[in-house]
Every structure is written in structure tokens, then in C-alpha cells.
Amino acid sequence: MSVQLEVETKTSAATVTEEIPVLDLGPFFAGEDGAAEKLAAELRYAQEEIGFYFVTNHGVPMDLIRRGYGELERVFALPDEEKLKLRATGTRPGYVPPNSVVYVTSPVNKNTKADLNEVLRYVNERPDDHPGRIAGRRFHGPNPWPENLPGFKETIKECHHALAALGRRILPLYALALDKPADFFDPFFDDPLWTT
């Protein structure tokens, strides 16, 4: 299964059509025979040939996804002075205003233009006594939460946990896609980091 995506370029009147793979997680989650191997092959193709994919039957409630997007809309609708109270600083995650960062991702093509996007980066917060927090490591928190948006923190944390659980559930597929045992990555995910 795939989704047709039409992209119109500014440099020509041509329309490019690419197929974005859609991976159905349902049979894998149901434990159907051969589902893991089939899905791992589809995942490998998607990652090697396309670079990204959609998933269906992932188990994350659509209501939660909608609520998460709704909360993000609320925070981005705040006045700039309120958003700047959440600003990422040093190792602290948080709000990154537009035109404040230049991303250089290639030694060949050195980008000098500021990124136009505004971003809200949050991480899975660690307890105060976590070694990463004590050492002041990046991506260990704490997150700066808006004070004037009731329910924001709870909804975003609920989204984080649901998506992290999904990532953990599909981790064996990545191992199988690389011709490794399904539990190959398990030792590396005893204290995982994530950022959104």
C-alpha cells in the first residue's frame, strides 16, 4: 500500500509524483505468522529507497494524536514574549524561535541561512537524581512547561509515552530489517532518550 504525494516545484511547471510506503503494523502486533519478517522487508525498502513511511494500525489513539496537535497549536499561538519564557538554552530543551538557528548538515554545502521554523523541543524528562540530569547532559530535561496552558503538560507527556511505547514495540522490526535477531537492539534501549 502507498499514498500518492504530488509535489509542485517552483523551478518548473512539472509535477513529481512519489509513492510513500504505508506499513500496516496490525498483523505484526496481532502476532500473525510471518508478519514480522514481511513488515521488516517493507521497512527496509522504505528506509533504503524512500527515506520515510506512514504506519497504520499503530495502536496510538487518534484522539490522543489530535489532542497533542491541539496543544501544540495552543502553545504556538501564544504571544512571542510568552513563548520566549520557554526558550531552549544550553542543554535545556524548549522553544526555538524562527530565524535563530542555522543548521549545517553537510561539509559540502555550508548553509548560512537561518531556519524559518519555530520549534518546541521536549524530551522525556529524567528525575532530578538521574546521572544525566546531575551532569547537565543535553536531552535529559527539565522541560520548560507553559504556566498558562492547563492540560498542556499532561497531554504532551501522554503523547510522548504513547509514541515511545510504539517505538519500543517496533524496534524488533528494525533489527530484522538489518538481518539481526529481533532482540538485537534491546541492550541499547534500557534508558532511551527521545526528543520531539
For the regions a protein language model found, what residue spans apply to each?
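Peripheral, non-catalytic segments flanking oxidoreductase cores
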Residues: 1-196
